[in-house]
Amino acid sequence: MALKSPAFRRKFPLLVTGGLLALQPLATSYAVAAEQFDCQVSAAGGWDCKPKAPVNNLPPRPVHEGAAVSSGTEAASEGETADRPMLVTEAKGRALKSRSEDYSHLDWVPREKLTAAQLAETGPYCGGAYVEPTRPGMADTTPKDESPTYINAKVSKYQQEQQIATLAGDVVMRQGSMQAEADEANLYQTENRGELKGNVKIRDNGSLVVGDEAQIQLDTGEAQVDNAEYVMHKSHIRGSALYAKRGENAIIRLKDGTYTTCEPGSNAWQLKGNNITLNPATGFGTATNVTLRVKDFPVFYTPYIYFPIDDRRQSGFLPPSFSTSSDTGFMLVTPYYFNLAPNYDATLYPRYMAKRGLLMEGEFRYLTPSSEGQFGGAYLNDKDDDRKEQTDYKDQRWMVNWQHKGGLDERLMTEVDYTDISDPFYFQDLESDQIGVESRDLLNQQGALTYRGDNYTARLNVHAYEMATISQITPYDRLPQITLNGVLPYNPGGLVMGYESEAVRFDRDLKDDFVRDKDGNPDFSAGAAGRRLDQNVSGIARANGNRFNVAPSISLPMEASYGYLTPKLKYAYTHYDLDLDSQGKAQAIAQSANPAYGSYNSSLNRDVPIFSVDSGLYFDRNTSLFGTNYKQTLEPRLFYLNVPYKDQRDIPIFDSSETLFSYDSLFRDNRFSGTDRIGDENKLSLGVTTRWIEDNGFERQNFSIGQAYYFKDRKVQLPGIYYKDRQSAQSDTSPYALVYNYYFNRDWRFNSDFNWDPDSRSTRSGSAMFHYQPEDNPNKVVNLGYRYRNDTIIYDSTTGTWKEGGSYGNPGDPNYIKDYYKIQQHDFSVIWPIVPQWSVIARWQHDYNRNRTLEAMGGFEYDNCCWKLRLINRYWIDYDDFSQALPANEKGDHGVFLQIVLKGLGGVVGNKVESFLDQGIQGYREREDQAY
């Protein structure tokens, strides 16, 4: 039944029905025993009820066993003899089994009874889930003061004079989305309140409060439940309190309450506080005088805490984290989040370090319809004096950064990536919690504006670098760089006419001041005492300059279902305006006698025609392999390239390097990256690829092999390298390039490449990688890989020259290491469940070239429905710039890392574990993203 409140009086509309009359349409009678009443609104605004004479004799009212309404005396007598109900404080963090053995009173459903959809939202190690039962009105959004009220009970009694209704037996009251249930209820009409007794349940949109007794305000929905337990279904949250108060705004306040995401039978962890407030409207809770209890044992205290109860954002303290290390001592981070608006927010990261002091760090994030980004900054007055004698160190440590991506319209895009730091040792000594800040040797200080037309792209770029190391030479800045690339909008006769153009200024300031190491002694890394690495840069390599490049091209793509043929002609013209200091000019004159170097000219021009023909065929056939049907393809490819020799020794290297040899490099028109070198080549590259494709489109495996045939030597080289001293530049053939990939299924894959040199009958480079991670169980991760490379061209900062091979420095130098840059490594990592809830975590990366372990770690993970623990023993090579010599800065380090994650609160200790697992184990991030 439903009854609207009279418009002139905001009172709870009372309507009681018995048995089969429950939840029927509007009526005006009360059912009490064998009598009926007519009830009308009185002049005073209350109810005026009079007995109604029945038309026919009513049949006897059915008696519900155990549901009779008792008098006050009878109730008191019964209470004296009944067993005292168990208090929630006696359960020590667990749910009360006295209310239901299977915790069904909290809507707990065992895992085996969950539907497939419910299982998908339940953690793999959870024994069940809180499932809100379907009920009438649960999605009702009508305001309380406008909602009709429905009441159902097996037996009812109404006292006309006192206007008190007494209900018994499966009492249900519903108004809007809120529903109250109890064994018995007394409803006081004049006070608009009710008293509920026995198995009390109060439900509202995704929440449930259970107790022994309750007081409820009938017109507002306010309620107080004694000896209460509560559940928030979607957030997997439960708890208890001496009493719980539900406000008119659905906010739940708990006295001496608890909060946890653990299963009903577990007390693995809980927050226990004097006063806990849960606000479903904001998605956050607060608590005062809080102890974090593990197995009901207090392990942490805070006078105040602010925590999420769902995935929404709200201002307040985020879960703190603490750790300890030799660099910082004890460290405590207490982040505070500012939810300023739906589209922008801020986070403050106060970081206390016992050895260094208080680092204040913060970030501001923004999101607009056309852009997104963040500002950040940090400051520390560093108390640690380990580096106080070292050059470039500053005790006033700071960092500022700005990342931005946006579009002024659908064609015009803007980008900013800017980071600046106080000294080059900032990221070696300090950590950052900011999103988007990367710790690397060269920090970007870049801004770009890009316009995308229908057939072209124009870009204005300003790109400088901030050094976060002293063991590298200062790089060139692009101040500015303008590019315009595209194709003409018409294609006469099928011709494609394209163009590439660039105008850029390269500039850098080479340092020449005196350098001291960590102990205050002159640094000998660069040769002479106190010498900067920048002073090893000599000759025209010291030049700054402007570069203008334009490269129009014309091609004729001819395509058919069985293959393609694309002849192409490109003309590259480059102009340089250079400026060089007196030191560089003098050195350039001396170096010009060496055939590997050029001479200095302030103005240079270079023009190079590039002709290529790319062609390929496509064949396929139906075949069978091990009982599986496949479509096998055969895709031969032929590529001819002719680039005449142009002497480029007078041109400095601003942004070029030699690309590594691979199967794909057989079909490139330049073996150098950048613009400062265009390789001379007259070659014919042959390659063939075959694939096995199943009927459903899944590519099971593919294999490619290729080789290039050279018709002349490759004379164009990087400065300091003479082609006659390099065997690979005079060979008639390239190494054989092989690529093989096999996909066991969508979970397993094997990827490999192999480059074998027939002249030296040795492997130039190669790699093999096995990766396993089931799509339906990403908790299993296995990686096994091997890498080998002995054909690198490196820039040696100790000599300021390019050279072939992997040695650091020259023989006789104190820091010389043979084959330092040669790669010969294996990498094995695994995360594997050994028994339910327990997984082993391990990684071993070994360098065979120098016979050393680069990183080794082993440990275990315990994953529970409500918490996770990782304990990992780790050894790694740490890089810390105490001098300019790279090898001298490599030191082995060791640590034991403990990470504890309380689900629903976040990481309490060991957040650093996330970073090295993410960087070191392929598939770890995918595993965590799909974890509960």
UniProtKB/Swiss-Prot annotation:
| First-listed, main subcellular location of the protein, grouped into a coarse class | membrane
Give the GO terms filed under biological process for this record: Gram-negative-bacterium-type cell outer membrane assembly; lipopolysaccharide transport
Q: Which residues form the signal peptide?
A: 1-33
> One cellular component GO annotation, for this chain's record?
cell outer membrane
**Entry-linked Pfam families:** LptD, LptD_N
Localization: Cell outer membrane
| GTP-binding as UniProt keyword | no
Entry superkingdom? Bacteria
Q: Show the segment(s) annotated as Disordered.
A: 54-87
Is NAD among the key words of this record? Answer: no
Sorted alphabetically, which keywords does the UniProt record give? Cell outer membrane, Membrane, Signal
InterPro entries according to UniProt: LipoPS_assembly_LptD (IPR020889), LptD (IPR050218), LptD_C (IPR007543), OstA-like_N (IPR005653)
Subunit description = Component of the lipopolysaccharide transport and assembly complex. Interacts with LptE and LptA.
- Describe the task this protein carries out: Together with LptE, is involved in the assembly of lipopolysaccharide (LPS) at the surface of the outer membrane.
What PANTHER family does the record point to? LPS-ASSEMBLY PROTEIN (PTHR30189), LPS-ASSEMBLY PROTEIN LPTD (PTHR30189:SF1)
Similarity comment: Belongs to the LptD family.
Instruction: Provide the protein name.
Output: LPS-assembly protein LptD
Q: Which organism is it from?
A: Pseudomonas putida (strain GB-1)
Quote the gene name from the UniProt entry. Answer: lptD
